């Protein structure tokens, strides 16, 4: 890949249009030439496909609606989102970018990671699992639920990092300490899913109460990791992603600002 992300996006989108008739039809209808992408302004002309429309296209032309730009034999997994929408995933190292989050959090060789995200149909569990392995950590594939059993696992295996929703992390930590005592709690790192409300205040309380550092990322089933925390304020955008903040009605790029209801549009560097 080149050092110019826009050049790589142009090459990838041009190649994809020759392999995916659904994508080519959308480009043609919008008068969009992917080979001419060289800036963020060019990406702003890219026709956006909403999930609702993709669902209809997949029902009419299963399984992927004409948008698969790879040889079917190269598809490693097919994830399923509500609808259902089928999302093909090629084999990707590092959990499609989640290894960057683990590295930022200081998780690596010698750590025991309890991964409580779902492992079936959706990508969360598998991507986190792959990323933890990529940085050299040992993974316990806990999955969803079984609080008492997972609390015992934490106490008896010396788990040092937990990947979980905020609510489930709290349930696990309380169960471990109440059942096995504070000395059984060896967890130092928590990679948490977000919650409504003042989530940052809740995280600060978790850090103080349970002696952990908390970390988070922004990701989707389609792209994997988009941005992640690195210890400073805010999020760092994955180096292979271009993120736009757009007005959902007009599609125009807007400056970030508090109190606005906007949407993210993300383009990714890829090899085809």
Where in the sequence are the language-model features?
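Hydrophobic alpha-helical segments that mediate membrane insertion or helix-helix packing
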Residues: 81-82, 113, 132, 243
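AMP-binding (ANL) adenylation modules
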Residues: 32, 119, 268-272
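Nucleotide 5′-phosphate-binding alpha/beta core
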Residues: 1-104, 108, 185
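Conserved ATP-dependent adenylate/AMP-binding module captured primarily in the ANL superfamily
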Residues: 98-112, 147-159
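Short, flexible loop segments at the rims of nucleotide/cofactor-binding pockets, characterized by
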Residues: 89-92, 117, 138-142
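Active-site glycine/GP-rich loop and adjacent strand/helix microenvironment
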Residues: 1-17, 135-272
């Amino acid at each position: 890949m080149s050092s110019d992300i826009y050049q790589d996006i142009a090459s990838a989108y041009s190649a994809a249009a020759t392999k995916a008739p659904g994508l080519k039809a959308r480009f043609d209808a919008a008068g969009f030439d992917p080979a001419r992408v060289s800036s963020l302004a060019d990406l702003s002309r890219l026709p956006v496909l909403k999930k609702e429309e993709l669902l209809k296209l997949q029902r009419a032309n299963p399984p992927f609606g004409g948008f698969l730009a790879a040889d079917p034999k190269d598809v490693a997994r097919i994830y399923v989102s509500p609808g259902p929408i089928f999302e093909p995933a090629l084999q990707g190292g590092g959990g499609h970018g989640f290894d960057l989050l683990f590295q930022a959090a200081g998780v690596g060789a010698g750590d025991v990671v309890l991964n409580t995200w779902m492992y079936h149909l959706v990508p969360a569990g598998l991507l986190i699992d792959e990323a933890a392995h990529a940085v050299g950590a040992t993974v316990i594939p806990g999955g969803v639920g079984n609080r008492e059993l997972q609390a015992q696992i934490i106490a008896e295996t010396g788990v040092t990092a937990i990947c979980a929703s905020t609510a489930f992390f709290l349930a696990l930590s309380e169960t471990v300490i109440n059942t096995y005592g504070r000395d059984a709690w060896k967890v130092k790192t928590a990679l948490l899913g977000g919650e409504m409300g003042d989530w940052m205040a809740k995280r600060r309380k978790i850090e103080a109460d349970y002696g952990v550092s908390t970390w988070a990322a922004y990701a989707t089933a389609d792209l994997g990791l988009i941005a992640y925390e690195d210890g400073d304020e805010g999020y760092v955008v994955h180096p292979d992603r271009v993120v736009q903040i757009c007005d959902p009605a007009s599609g125009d790029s807007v400056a970030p600002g508090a109190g606005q209801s906007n949407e993210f549009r993300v383009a990714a560097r890829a090899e085809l």
